[in-house]
UniProtKB/Swiss-Prot annotation:
Protein name listed in UniProt: E3 ubiquitin-protein ligase RGLG5
GO cellular component, as recorded: plasma membrane
Pfam families per record: Copine, zf-C3HC4_3
Location of the protein in the cell: Cell membrane
Quaternary structure and interacting proteins, as annotated: Interacts with PP2CA.
Bias (Polar residues) ranges: 40-61, 347-383
Molecular function via GO: transferase activity; zinc ion binding
InterPro entries cross-referenced by the UniProt entry: Copine_C, E3_ligase/Copine_domain, VWF_A, vWFA_dom_sf, Znf_RING, Znf_RING/FYVE/PHD
Summary of the function given for this chain in its UniProt record: Together with RGLG1, mediates the ubiquitination and subsequent proteasomal degradation of the target protein PP2CA. Functions as a positive regulator of abscisic acid (ABA) signaling through ABA-dependent degradation of PP2CA, a major inhibitor of ABA signaling.
Highest taxon listed in the record's lineage: Eukaryota
Changes after translation: N-myristoylated.
Catalysed reactions, semicolon-separated: S-ubiquitinyl-[E2 ubiquitin-conjugating enzyme]-L-cysteine + [acceptor protein]-L-lysine = [E2 ubiquitin-conjugating enzyme]-L-cysteine + N(6)-ubiquitinyl-[acceptor protein]-L-lysine
């Protein structure tokens, strides 16, 4: 299972009380919903709890879904929060996942003044803005106000793991502490890749399981799409894409909603179509929102924040309702991924990924960050291998050169407007082979 701190936290200990509140209010909750026909996708074959629940029910095409009609003319976050409450959302726990892949260094070229999207300055960066807006909107629905917060895609996790923002995987107390931890840890990180959302989704499933089946919202903030190599066949998926799709399907067995917020320049075409490529799920548990498109509008800042919050959360009440109707709320599946978070990175000479997964040592608190300089130089073979691969996707070989002399793979290079290495404007692209 996950870290012991998760089980000992007030969130885990209060699962019974919170679940009783949700169920006891379900009758009044239902009255807030407008009814309309809908098509619910068939259950994933491995979703045994869902399958057994539906065994005596009508076929998916004949089921009815109760949608809340949430308008889109709100002027403040408070109005959006009130609308969510009126629509029936009673209880929600937030989990935050932050993309710290290397592409964050150049995907803010147009939308963030050519700065890294993780740049910490006097004004909030896109990640800080998204955390603040969603945190403020959902805080009234979170009884214990504890927020698990994780990073993925750095030099210790790549596309295989997540790291916690706190020692021993303790949770942040409110979104203000999430922002504080973010400001402290992000400047020390070695951004890397590739990008996969599977590890953070699996960690969220583990948290839901440990809580006894409380409803959670996983907020993933990312600067780019799941890594896709140019070698991937048309109509096929890269390993990272397939793992992410499988994780989203499996997550529909849990009372868990996934909101993916795209920050930076994109492109986001694949993520907009991602939902259509996901096979049958117990319920539609995935929502993508383009943060940059909304926040670049020429309207009042408060209106922009309200529009973003609404776009990100407007499906939450209906998804919460689905977990009630499917009997997912307050239940343990008995077969969660048992995803354990790594401790905050220190980038010691030995990668944390090579240390025992169950280790929760807090000794790193007394060790200074090495600012990217290892006391033991990496092997020449490793360096040479790294230099052969595209610095953007870290998967494909370099086969496209720019006017500045730097290289990427052709798949990534076609979408770039500035060089990811020197940030010069790209005016010439040369296919090497």
């Amino acid at each position: 299972m996950g870290g012991s701190s998760s089980k000992e936290s007030p969130r885990g200990g209060g699962s019974g009380r919170r679940y009783e509140r949700s169920v006891s209010g379900s009758s009044s909750y239902s009255s807030a919903w407008d009814q309309s026909s809908y098509y619910q996708t068939p259950n994933h074959p491995s979703a045994s709890p869902v399958s057994s629940y539906n065994s005596g029910r009508q076929t998916p095409k004949n089921l009815e879904r109760k949608y809340s009609r949430i308008a889109d003319n709100y002027r403040s976050i408070d109005e959006v929060t009130a609308a969510l409450s009126h629509a029936g959302l009673e209880s929600s726990n937030l989990i935050v996942g932050i993309d710290v892949t290397k592409s964050n260094e150049w995907t803010g070229a147009r939308s963030f003044g050519r700065k890294s999207l993780h740049f910490i300055g006097t004004t909030p960066n896109p990640y800080q803005q998204a955390i603040s807006i969603i945190g403020k909107t959902l805080s009234v629905f979170d009884e214990d106000n504890l927020i698990p917060c994780y990073g993925f895609g750095d030099a210790t996790t790549h596309d295989q793991d997540v790291f916690s923002f706190n020692p021993n995987d303790t949770y942040c107390n409110g979104f203000e502490e999430v922002l504080m931890c973010y400001r402290e840890i992000v400047p020390q990180l070695r951004l890397s890749g590739p990008t996969s959302f599977a590890p953070i989704i699996e960690r969220a499933m583990t948290i839901v399981e440990e809580s006894g089946g409380q409803y959670h919202v996983l907020l993933i903030i990312a600067d780019g799409q799941v890594t896709r190599s140019v070698d991937t066949d048309n109509g096929g998926f890269s390993p990272q894409e397939q793992q992410t799709i499988d994780a989203i399907v499996r997550a529909s067995e849990y009372p868990l909603s996934i909101v993916l917020v795209g920050v930076g320049d994109g492109p986001w075409d694949t993520m907009r179509q991602f939902d259509d490529n996901i096979p049958a799920r117990a319920f539609d548990n995935f929502q993508f929102v383009n943060f940059t498109d909304i926040m670049s509008k020429n309207i009042d800042p408060a209106r922009k924040e309200a529009e973003f919050a609404l776009s990100a959360l407007m499906e939450i009440p209906s998804q919460y309702k689905a977990t009630l109707e499917l009997g997912l709320l307050g239940q343990r599946t008995g077969h969660c991924p048992d995803r354990i978070a790594l401790p905050p990175p220190t980038y010691a000479t030995q990668s944390m990924r090579n240390s025992p997964r169950t280790s929760r040592s807090t000794s790193f608190q007394n060790k200074p960050y090495d600012n990217g300089v290892s006391s033991t130089p990496p092997s020449t073979t490793h360096n040479e291998s790294q230099q052969q691969f595209c610095p953007v996707c870290l998967v494909s070989a370099k086969n496209m050169a720019f006017n500045c002399g730097h290289q990427t793979c052709a798949g990534c290079g076609e979408d770039l407007h500035v060089c990811p290495i020197c940030r010069s404007s790209i005016s010439v692209r040369i296919k090497l082979y």
